[in-house]
Amino acid sequence: QLSSEINSKAVYPSDGPPYAPFYSWAVLTGKAFVSPLKLLVHEDVGLMISYRGALILYQSIEIPINCEKSPCETCREPCKSACPVDAFKVSSYDSSACKSYLSIETGQHMCSENGCHVRTSCPLSATNGRHPEQTKFHMKAFLKK
């Protein structure tokens, strides 16, 4: 509904192929940065950021320029060692190792109920206020893929 009200087109990460470049768009905002694990990190909510949709505008708008530096530049980077199964590599992510861990009791408690340990290890994520039920919902959706 919003898209028709402001003369735009709604797009979602799952639309495609071709898939919209959400990752690149996020970085271009100057509010999201590439973390040491290649996940997006947001200046306010850390690694808990997720992009569920976007609006493609049919008119030009001015976007404020954000010259902030990545919060990772001054961080001790706890995300790099937080994964209990070392699923994050320099250039890849082992989703099967992650899902296997989530199927055992320890993994269910540590990550399924409380959120991805890597994401929650980010100091900025600790202050984001995400509701535990929202975290559980997204972890269940991840396991269904």
Indicate where each model-derived feature is located:
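Non-ligating segments of multi-cofactor redox enzymes
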Residues: 1-145
